[in-house]
């Protein structure tokens, strides 16, 4: 059978007219390869960096590498059922997590799904996990304190609302303990907390959650957990998800505190993803943008102005500034703070609390090295009474450590040096504190007052802590009005100083310690 050209054209025209063409907005591609949770996709020409991709079986992924002829994506969740040739669709959405007060008291994964067995979370709002930090114009200087309840931190390296204070040290030297004590101490202080656990053992995370529950701190805390058994993608995303949950409170004129425990594990997870995506490795095999990984996260912790809050809430909240305070944790190897990730995070943050294994093993806990630890902005936020009383304590302790090292070789020391060493020993003892027992402002003030005015000088070192505890009990029973004044005003007037001198003398005479 032969068709002439006119018949062929008629046939084509009729076929074209009868064609039902519906344009699908979504772009589609095909899986080329799947390895270690990384998928290479061909044909996604319209995809955005960081866009959510839909795989078969209701599985989602994140587009991270946009190359000329393919897209590199990381799978969020299980990937065993994904195979070569599967169809992948773009969603046109960036990854979002649920936010809001409904999350308080709950344990969630990096995507905001509940993992505590307490049922679904009915959050009314979701927000993108990647956001640009507030600009310079919208920020305010740090002026209100975050009371950690730890004598050595509140006196020597104070933390303010909106500050980023790094907790750095080797493994097993009390970094998590400092962070958890800070969360426990926020009870009744109108500060919401987010604890982000990255790459930790599930049992360790459970211990923290149990302790927060026992102390009643879980009711104002959100726990975001990406344990060691979860994929590198989840460990990489968890800090950003937690930060978005904290920003919800910051942007509505409230105060929030976020602990990232720890960012070393996040850097390891990101390094793993980057190497699998075939990005060129740099120093210590980290990718070139590992600094940006942490800087864009920590810059989102800020104190924002009243104008920012009013603009963000469309005038619903007026005259209130909000803050997000960050306590990132970094684990060092053998005390080496000059490694790549520690130096990066030290340069991004507003100070660091340096914990030492030697001090920890010597029974000085929290094991804070006074000479290296610093708070670059927290001094402005310190309460007046603590600022007044803690003036020289950091210098004294740093000098004491230097002298103590020198005194091991010197046999005959002059009187002034001997006095400084004795005072240093007692102050070091005074700053020791058991875990899960944070102190109130008046308790810290009284302890510092006793040390500054020489009331500890004639005590044996072993008597210092019993003396401090006995003094607190004595003041509670005999001078409750003085305690209330210090707590309410956060100041120590001349009259109160005289009263405190009298109380201390009376207590020492009684010998009830």
From Swiss-Prot:
Catalysed reactions, as listed in the record: ATP + H2O + 4 H(+)(in) = ADP + phosphate + 5 H(+)(out)
Gene3D superfamilies: 2.40.30.20, ATP synthase alpha/beta chain, C-terminal domain, P-loop containing nucleotide triphosphate hydrolases
Site (Required for activity) location in chain: 373
EC class: translocase
Membrane topology: Peripheral membrane protein
A Pfam entry, by short name: ATP-synt_ab
Binding site for ATP: 169-176
Compartments it resides in: Cell inner membrane
Chief location bin: membrane
GO MF annotations, alphabetized: ADP binding; ATP binding; proton-transporting ATP synthase activity, rotational mechanism
UniProt-listed InterPro entries: ATP_synth_asu-like_sf, ATP_synth_asu_C, ATP_synth_asu_C_sf, ATP_synth_F1_a_nt-bd_dom, ATP_synth_F1_asu, ATPase_a/bsu_AS, ATPase_F1/V1/A1_a/bsu_N, ATPase_F1/V1/A1_a/bsu_N_sf
One GO cellular component term: proton-transporting ATP synthase complex
Subunit structure: F-type ATPases have 2 components, CF(1) - the catalytic core - and CF(0) - the membrane proton channel. CF(1) has five subunits: alpha(3), beta(3), gamma(1), delta(1), epsilon(1). CF(0) has three main subunits: a(1), b(2) and c(9-12). The alpha and beta chains form an alternating ring which encloses part of the gamma chain. CF(1) is attached to CF(0) by a central stalk formed by the gamma and epsilon chains, while a peripheral stalk is formed by the delta and b chains.
PANTHER family: ATP SYNTHASE SUBUNIT ALPHA, MITOCHONDRIAL (PTHR48082:SF2)
Job description of the protein: Produces ATP from ADP in the presence of a proton gradient across the membrane. The alpha chain is a regulatory subunit.
Family: Belongs to the ATPase alpha/beta chains family.
Protein name: ATP synthase subunit alpha 2
Biological source species: Paraburkholderia xenovorans (strain LB400)
Phylogenetic lineage: Bacteria, Pseudomonadati, Pseudomonadota, Betaproteobacteria, Burkholderiales
């Amino acid at each position: 059978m032969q068709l002439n050209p006119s018949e062929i054209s008629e046939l084509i025209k009729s076929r074209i007219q009868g064609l039902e063409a519906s344009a699908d907005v979504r772009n589609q591609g095909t899986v080329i390869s799947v390895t270690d949770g990384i998928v290479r996709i061909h044909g996604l020409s319209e995809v955005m960096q960081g866009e959510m991709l839909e795989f078969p079986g209701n599985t989602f992924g994140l587009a991270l590498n946009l190359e000329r002829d393919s897209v590199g994506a990381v799978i969020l969740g299980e990937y065993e059922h994904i195979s070569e040739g599967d169809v992948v669709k773009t969603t046109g959405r960036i990854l979002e997590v649920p936010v809001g007060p409904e999350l308080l008291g709950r344990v969630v994964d990096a995507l905001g799904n509940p993992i505590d067995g307490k049922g679904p979370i009915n959050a009314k709002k979701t927000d993108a996990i990647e956001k640009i930090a507030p600009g310079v114009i919208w920020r305010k200087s740090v002026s209100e304190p975050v009371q950690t309840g730890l004598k050595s931190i509140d006196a020597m390296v104070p933390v303010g609302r909106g500050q980023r204070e790094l907790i750095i040290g080797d493994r097993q030297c009390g970094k998590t303990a400092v962070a958890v004590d800070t969360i426990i101490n926020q009870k009744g202080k109108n500060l919401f907390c987010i604890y982000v656990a990255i790459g930790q053992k599930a049992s360790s995370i459970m211990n923290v959650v149990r302790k927060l529950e026992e102390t009643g701190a879980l009711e104002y805390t959100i726990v975001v957990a990406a344990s060691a058994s979860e994929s590198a993608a989840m460990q990489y995303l968890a800090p950003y998800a937690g930060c978005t949950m904290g920003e919800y409170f910051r942007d509505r004129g409230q105060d929030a505190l976020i602990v990232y425990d720890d960012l070393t594990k996040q850097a390891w997870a990101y390094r793993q993803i980057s190497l699998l995506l075939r990005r060129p490795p740099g120093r210590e095999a980290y990718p070139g943008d590992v600094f940006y990984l942490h800087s864009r996260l920590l810059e989102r912790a800020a104190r924002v102005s009243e104008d920012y809050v009013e603009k963000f809430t469309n005038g619903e909240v007026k005259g209130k500034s909000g803050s997000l305070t960050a306590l990132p944790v970094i684990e060092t190897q053998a005390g080496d703070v000059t490694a790549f990730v520690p130096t990066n995070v030290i340069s991004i943050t507003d100070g660091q609390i340096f914990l030492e294994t030697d001090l920890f093993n010597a029974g000085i806990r929290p094991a804070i090295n006074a000479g290296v630890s610093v708070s670059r902005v927290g001094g402005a936020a310190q309460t007046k009474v603590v600022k007044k009383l803690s003036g020289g304590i950091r210098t004294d302790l740093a000098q004491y450590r230097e002298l103590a090292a020198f005194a091991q070789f010197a046999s005959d020391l002059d009187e002034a040096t001997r006095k400084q060493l004795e005072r240093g020993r007692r102050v070091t003892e005074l700053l020791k504190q058991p875990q899960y027992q944070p102190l109130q402002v008046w308790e810290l003030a009284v302890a510092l007052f006793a040390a500054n005015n020489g009331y500890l000088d004639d005590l044996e070192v072993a008597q210092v802590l019993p003396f401090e505890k006995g003094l607190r009990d004595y003041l509670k029973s005999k001078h409750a009005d003085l305690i209330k004044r210090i707590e309410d005003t956060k100041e120590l007037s001349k009259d109160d100083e005289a009263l405190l001198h009298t109380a201390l003398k009376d207590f020492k005479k009684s010998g009830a310690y």
